[in-house]
Design a protein with these regions (language model features):
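ATP/NTP-dependent adenylation/nucleotidyl-transfer catalytic domains that generate, transfer
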Residues: 1-161
Length: 161
């Protein structure tokens, strides 16, 4: 944590700057007055992506279960505790419909791109648990179709009743 006092002020300024930088696939800077392209605007909030990926890989949960947990974790930013130094403007909340929509996009992209993992050369497994490497624990056919996961996701209502 930057506010823990582990680093000097100059280092803290650099770390805050890095954390505050928008992540973008664009290598060309935006023109003056334009916003840089936001990866999160295209693929969804990283906090939801990470939450979904963790529960899918680590626990093998169905999408409907992940959405249920996501909704309980992210429905109200004012509830629960946040890490020390976590800025108020970075405390997000998402309604059920948004969570379901971002999960749908995640499933389509994640499952539809498994073929990219099978092109890696053979090599050693370095880390246990949660690896997406073809030599790791994750095993999914490179020609997998997301239909079963998307069908499960459709069992989730768009709004909470």
């Amino acid at each position: 944590c930057i506010s823990s006092g582990q680093f000097n002020e100059a280092t803290n300024v650099v770390l805050e700057s890095v954390l505050g930088t928008e992540i973008s696939p664009e290598l060309v800077p935006a023109r003056p007055g334009e916003k840089i392209q936001s990866t999160q605007a295209k693929i969804g909030p990283y906090e939801l992506q990470d939450f979904t990926l963790y529960h899918l890989l680590r626990h093998g949960m169905r999408p409907s279960r992940i959405v249920f947990l996501s909704h309980h974790a992210w429905r109200d930013a004012s509830v629960g505790s946040w890490p020390p130094g976590f800025h108020d403007e970075d405390r997000h909340s998402y309604d059920l419909s948004a969570i379901k929509g971002w999960t749908r996009l995640f499933l389509r992209r994640f499952i539809g791109n498994q073929f990219k993992r099978s092109t890696l050369p053979n090599g050693p497994k370095v880390v246990a648990g949660g690896s997406l490497s073809p030599r790791g624990d994750w095993r999914m056919p490179s020609d997998a179709v997301a239909r079963a996961w998307l069908d499960d996701l459709e069992t989730v209502p768009d709004e909470r009743s």
